[in-house]
Amino acid sequence: QVKAVRSYTLPWLRGAGPLTSGNNVEVQLRGEFSPVSINTVVRTILTPLAFLNIDAAVSLGTGWTAAGLNGLALNTMADPFEPIPLEGLVLGTSFGLTGQFDFGVLVPGDWTHVAVVYRAGLDYRLNTAAGEAVPWQWLADAGENFNGWTWNQTALLAYQTPALKLVDAFGVLLETNQNITQFHESPMNEGGWGSDFMEVFLGPIVVLKWGGSHSLNIQFQFATERDYTDESVGNEHFFYRRMDTANPTYWYFRRAAFSYTFVCSQ
C-alpha cells in the first residue's frame, strides 16, 4: 500500500508557558492506494497541551478484485467472500485522545529521552453495500468487519539514543482492537465464534532516520487469535466456528512490517 500525505499546521491558543507554547492544529490530507483499493482520509489533530492530542478523522474509499484478492466483498454464510467491486463505499470516522510524555523533560540530557505514548480511540465504519449485521471484507482481510463501532488502543514505550547514527528510536508497541456493535452477538464464554474477542498486537519497533527527509519503521509483530474447537475450526465461515472455552486464545507471529516515509521539502 502506498500513502501520500499533505499536512498543514497552524498555531492555536498558544500561551507563554512550556505546556501551551507549542499549541497547534494540524490538518492531514491522505490518499491511500493499493492494487485492490483506493481510500481518502481527512484528519485533524488538536494539541491543547504539550502532552495531549485530540484527533478526529473522516474517510471514504472503495475496492475491487485483482489477482484473486478482494478489496471489497461481502462475507455471508450463503456466499462467503463474494466480491462486490466498486459496488459500495466504505465510510469511516474516528475519534481519539493521546497522552504522551518524555522523561527527558524531568532529567535533561542526551541519554534520558524515554518516551511513553498512549492513545484510546473509537472508530466507526460503514460499507454501504452491506446490510445490518452482515460481515464484509476490506483490503483482503479476514472478512469479519461489521457496520458499526470498534474500540482501539495504542501504547508505545520508546527510547531515543544518541549512540547509534541511523537509529532515531526503538521500543515496544502494543495495539488492541475490539468490536463494540457486535460485542454480545456470539461471546467467547458461551462457546460462540467470539464476537467479544479483543485482538492484541505486540512487538518491537525500530525507527531509522537519515538525510533529514527519509525514515524507515521496522516492526516485528505478534498477535492473539481465537482458538476454535477441533470440530469447527475448518468451517469456511466464521459464524460456524465455536470457541474452545478451555483455551480460548493463543499467540502467533503475525508479520514483519517495513514502512518507508519520504518528507518533501516545502
Map each language-model feature to its residues.
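Repeated loop/turn-to-beta-strand initiation elements of outer-membrane beta-barrel proteins
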Residues: 12-18, 50-54, 105-115, 162-171, ...
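Outer-membrane beta-barrel translocator domains and adjoining extracellular loop/strand segments
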Residues: 39-42, 57, 66-73, 127-137, ...
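Extracellular loop and loop/strand-boundary signature of outer-membrane beta-barrel proteins
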Residues: 28-30, 80-86, 134-145, 182-194, ...
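Residues on the lipid-exposed face of transmembrane beta-strands in outer-membrane beta-barrel proteins
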Residues: 2-10, 42-48, 95-105, 120-122, ...
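Transmembrane beta-strand segments that form the barrel wall of outer-membrane beta-barrel proteins
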Residues: 1, 22-35, 39-42, 54-58, ...
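Outer-membrane beta-barrel "beta-signal"
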Residues: 95-96, 237-266
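Residues that define the transmembrane beta-barrel architecture of outer-membrane proteins
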Residues: 1-6, 23, 36-40, 50, ...
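Transmembrane beta-strands of outer-membrane beta-barrel pores
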Residues: 6-12, 31-35, 48, 58-64, ...
